[in-house]
Amino acid sequence: MKLSKKISLTALLLAPALYSSGAGFQIQEQGASNMGTAMAGAVTNANNDATAAFANPSALSFLNKGDKNTVISISGAAVLPTLAYKGNDGRVADCAVNSYVPNFFAAHKFNDRITASMSITAPYGLESKYDKNWQGNAQGIHSYLMTADFNPSVSLKITDWLSVSGGLSAQFAYVKLTQNAPYEKMSGDSWGIGGNIGITIQYADEGRIGFSWRSSVHHEFSGDAHSKSAYAPILGNPDIEAEVDIPHTFTVGVYQRLPDLFDRFAIMADYTYTMWSSFDELKVSGLAAPFSEKEDWKDTSRISLGLHYYPKFDENLTLRIGSAFDESPVKTVNRTVRIPCGDRVWFSTGAGYKYGAFTFDAGYSYIMVVGNTDINKGGVNGHYYGHIHVISAQITYEF
């Protein structure tokens, strides 16, 4: 498959962005420890674990594990959405599909200055599936996107209060689309390369500021289209291609353990800017007739706030709450059945418990879809509604 670089990967593939946990088709589920605060504190490694290998490897320079030099965190999240289209005529079409998102993170301190890390994550994806006879089946029935991102990084502690990091991402992506159309199925895969840079400033013993940039990843999908048997003699099953650029993201955050009477609390906040505006058109080449679709996405902001509580009765326990607002990149006029994206509001809670060399974390988020989710495209006239439950668990081992 081949989408032009101006395209939204979303358009070509998506699991309804409405139910990917981040804006567009971005997945915001990198670590159960971060899930408890709606991902606030991820860029400053507020949880003192290996999940910063994805969010901001430079923060790993300030890992506090005593004489332990290696930390491994493994997490998984169950995404349980409710998503449906309701037409102005009253007809309802469900398209939600439950999914599981795994993640792996590791960090090793070679000395006081150099730390290496590795993350294996699924930063983009999800899935939607309508009944094959629903009224918009010509526009989409099954949409599936899977990504796997392999991201080694190295961080350098320049001074006692400043660290920087750099890394490379090798990202695999696979997409499959089905629809009630002459070409009833299209699929393709791609490998792309990206990079990441991080900066962390520890301005106090219990205070940090973090910055992270993740580059765009360029994908050149190749695959094939399968035509219905009635059209096969004319259309065949051609090879198709599409070029897609995953957008740049910029994140800045702050973590602060409170002093004096409030020293059992820590507060944190993260802000992420995603440059979705580079996606304005979808093009697929190799088909019998040219195909393109206007996307015209906009850049988005995400802000999250979190709170940790460290109970006096048990020094090994951490309790977490958080909330976030995640802006949609999709304009109403360009909303499609494959990407019925809307703004989201997060409410999250979680806990962590340290037991010897192990730490166990659990997180839960309830994500509401808010704002305008109307659609008026090709006879599909109505709106989308729904919400998401995300349940995550994580184990961390240090040695």
What are these regions (language model features)?
Residues 39-43, 71-81:
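Short strand-turn segments of transmembrane beta-barrel domains in outer membranes
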Residues 1-21:
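Gram-negative bacterial Sec-dependent N-terminal signal peptides
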